[in-house]
Regions:
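Helix-to-loop junction immediately C-terminal to a conserved catalytic motif
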Residues: 3
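Conserved ABC ATPase "signature" region
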Residues: 65-83
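Conserved ABC transporter NBD signature motif
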Residues: 11-21, 29
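Conserved beta-strand-loop-alpha-helix hinge in the C-terminal portion
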Residues: 167-192
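Conserved catalytic motifs of ABC-family nucleotide-binding domains
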Residues: 108
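Catalytic Walker B motif of ABC-type/P-loop ATPase nucleotide-binding domains
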Residues: 112-115
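Conserved ABC ATPase signature
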Residues: 87-91, 95
Length: 228
C-alpha cells in the first residue's frame, strides 16, 4: 500500500502528501518508499551483487558516475564491499538480507519498509541486521517501518503499532505497550522486559522504560550507585 503496489479498497494512502492512487505520483512515491521482502530470494534478480544494487538507480536513468557512487556507498554501509563481485545467491541468509537492504538504500529513499526481516536468520544474523537498522535510523536519519511477529525485533523502535484484522489495537512506545498487561492484546513482551517486570515486583526500583539489555545494565548500575 505504501508504495502503490496495492491500492486501498477504502480510504486513501498518502506519502508526503501524494495519493498512491494518482499515477502521476507513483514514480516519486516508489523512489521515496523502498521495500525489503521477508524472503530476499524473492527480490534478488541479478547474478552479481553490485549489479543487483545498481538495478534500481539505473531505472532512474541516473548518470553512470552517480550510480557507481551510490553502489559503493551502500555496500560500505552494509559491509559487503569486498563481496561486490559475488553472486547474491551464494550468500548466507543474513548476507542476502543485507544485499536487499543495500539495493533499497541505493534508491535513497525517505522510508524503508521491511517485512519480517529476521524470520529466516539465526540469532547472530538477526542481531547483525537489527544493529544495521539502528545505525541507518539513528545515524543516517532514515525512517524505518519494520513488520514483525517477534517482539524481540521491536525493542529499539520509537513507536509500536499492534494490528488485528486491519484495526489498530495499540499505538504507543514499545516500553509502554509491553507494560500495559492488557490480555486482549495477546502481546508477549521480550525476555528483558519480563525480567525487569519480575525485578520490580521484588522491590527493585528499575526504570519502566527498559526494553534492551543495555538499558537494563544502565538501570541496575544506577540502582547500585544509589544504594552505596
Amino acid at each position: 500500500l505504501l508504495n502503490g503496489l496495492l491500492l486501498p479498497s477504502a480510504g486513501k494512502v498518502t506519502v508526503n502528501g501524494m495519493d498512491t492512487r494518482a499515477r502521476r505520483h507513483i514514480r516519486e512515491i516508489r523512489r521515496l518508499v523502498a521495500m525489503v521482502f521477508q524472503n530476499p530470494d524473492n527480490q534478488l534478480v541479478s547474478p552479481v551483487i553490485e549489479e543487483e544494487v545498481a538495478f534500481g538507480p539505473e531505472n532512474l536513468n541516473l548518470p553512470e558516475d552517480e550510480i557507481e557512487h551510490r553502489v559503493e556507498k551502500v555496500l560500505q554501509i552494509v559491509g559487503l564491499s569486498e563481496l561486490r563481485q559475488m553472486s547474491p545467491h551464494m550468500l548466507s541468509g543474513g548476507q542476502k538480507q543485507r544485499v536487499a537492504i543495500a539495493a533499497a538504500l541505493a534508491m535513497q529513499p525517505d522510508y524503508l519498509v521491511l517485512d519480517e526481516p529476521t524470520s529466516m536468520l539465526d540469532q547472530s544474523g538477526r542481531q547483525m541486521i537489527l544493529e544495521y537498522l539502528q545505525i541507518l535510523n539513528k545515524q543516517q536519519g532514515l525512517t524505518i517501518i519494520l513488520i514483525s511477529h517477534n517482539m524481540e525485533d521491536l525493542t529499539g523502535a520509537d513507536r509500536l503499532i499492534l494490528l488485528q484484522e486491519g484495526s489498530i489495537l495499540c499505538d504507543a512506545p514499545p516500553w509502554e505497550a509491553f507494560n500495559r498487561g492488557e490480555k486482549h492484546l495477546d502481546l508477549k513482551p521480550p525476555g528483558i522486559v519480563l525480567l525487569a517486570q519480575m525485578l520490580r515486583k521484588r522491590g527493585y526500583l528499575l526504570d519502566k522504560r527498559i526494553t534492551t539489555l543495555e538499558q537494563m545494565e544502565n538501570s541496575i548500575c544506577r540502582l547500585l550507585r544509589s544504594t552505596t
